[in-house]
């Protein structure tokens, strides 16, 4: 039964990836169908992630009160329903509503997946390693979603609506598994008074600041890589440009998945996690700068691959290193705080890139991402110096 619980937790983080990358996967097609510009598309992304910010803070205490299963079932159900709404919404307003509902479903699954994974994998002894392995399946979602979108849109010549509906059907299958699985009772005692106290902990504050930078980077890449590559390939009207751009987005997800699987093979990753975050942040700065200056699609793809590999260990290692400084009973509280704070970056930075790209190019707006990566590098220098691990693997 514990294995099935782990499987559903992995399905949950896989589905969160679908929620985060689906708009980027159909960006060119959706913008053409709705006749909207980059700024309006960026507002859709902001609607999704602003909802995530609010819901992430609320869903923690609900999980403690109701248990994992109701939240998992709700998450899969709402995520599937919002994907169907996104698929068949006839106008911009309903697409925005779909994005809002997508945020609700995503954060239900995010809480279930990311709080269960460090407990059920590696017997709970190495949170950073477990988080990397679990979030490799998030990376898998980043691969499969744009790959399926490209297959459906460009090979099978399906509409973006039909393509998204098929992906929504996949999430419905995951719902069946959640309904059939027994979950452990929630072990985390999320109380508002406890959360307030945690906000004063330097380790929690640093993790939140680091995730603001990281989420701004990951969501920006997931949202704008396809549009960036379409620009470098000559525009949407050039034959095959959108399909090749979609494959570039898939390669970004593939690099993240591979990087997280590799990171999960590092024993006692929690102990060396701060150094890993620092090195990955520095590599991210270099790769993003290359994306900004290059005019070559091939060089851009190489930079995208390096960016995916660099991003791979950052989020799960930040989470794991921070968890290791506290008792497991506080994991839900800590995750709710740092992820909700981090989502502020994912909410506003991609939207800002979109607004700055109107009448210009996505490539010309990417320096914002380079600055975020640089700030993350500076913050990472302090993560290992604040707080002492409560337990070792």
Describe every region a protein language model picked out.
Residues 4-38, 110, 114, 221-226:
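Extracytoplasmic
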Residues 54-90:
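Conserved MFS/SLC helix-loop-helix module at the cytosolic interface between two early adjacent transmembrane helices
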Residues 98-136:
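Cytoplasmic helix-loop-helix junction between adjacent transmembrane helices
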Residues 132-183:
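Helix-loop-helix hairpin linking two adjacent transmembrane segments in secondary transporters
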Residues 21, 49-57, 143, 253-261, ...:
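Residue-level signature of mid-helix packing/kink "hotspots" within the transmembrane helices
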Residues 323-362:
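A late C-terminal transmembrane helix in Major Facilitator Superfamily
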Residues 35, 67, 88-93, 271, ...:
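Helix-breaking motifs and short loop linkers at transmembrane-helix boundaries and internal kinks
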Residues 23-24, 202-250, 257:
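Extracytoplasmic gate region of multi-pass secondary transporters
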